[in-house]
Amino acid sequence: MRLNTLSPSLGSRKNHKRLGRGIGSGFGKTAGRGHKGQKSRSGGHVNRGFEGGQMPIYRRIPKFGFNSRKKNITAEVRLSDISKLSTDIIDLKVLKKENIINKNIKYVKIILSGKLEVALTLHGLRVTRGARLAIENYGGKIEG
């Protein structure tokens, strides 16, 4: 093997299409665009969803649903995430300070997910039935 004998393996390099460069290339004259029509012209294209003037499907089908504004101010927090915190008394301010929830969140619900490792006191937070049982069985309290 010498430097002058090195060449790329077969099929690894492909020549680009040279459009409009003679009849023998296979892409001469019309350059692969066919004859006439909007798509053969320069700058000639149709917008996404255009169906030739027919009412497009995205306008034929009715709108449905909505985006709730409540989801921007509510959050669910796992019990396992809370048990990793250094403090025993947990409220909205603590969760925001520890970057568990966003600063815009106003309502939090604690859900049972993972293991509880310490006795916690929750203040002013909503709790699911399973999470409540887990906290109380471990010696924790839920206030307010």
Swiss-Prot record:
Residues 1-51 are annotated as: Disordered. Pfam families: Ribosomal_L27A. GO terms for biological process: translation. The keyword RNA-binding applies. Keywords: Ribonucleoprotein, Ribosomal protein, RNA-binding, rRNA-binding. Residues 1-12 have a biased composition (Polar residues). GO terms for cellular component: cytosolic large ribosomal subunit. InterPro entries: Ribosomal_uL15, Ribosomal_uL15/eL18, Ribosomal_uL15/eL18_sf, Ribosomal_uL15_bac-type, Ribosomal_uL15_CS. Residues 21-31 have a biased composition (Gly residues). GO terms for molecular function: rRNA binding; structural constituent of ribosome. Part of the 50S ribosomal subunit. Binds to the 23S rRNA. PANTHER family: 50S RIBOSOMAL PROTEIN L15, LARGE RIBOSOMAL SUBUNIT PROTEIN UL15M. Belongs to the universal ribosomal protein uL15 family. This is Large ribosomal subunit protein uL15. The lineage of its organism: Bacteria, Pseudomonadati, Pseudomonadota, Gammaproteobacteria, Enterobacterales.
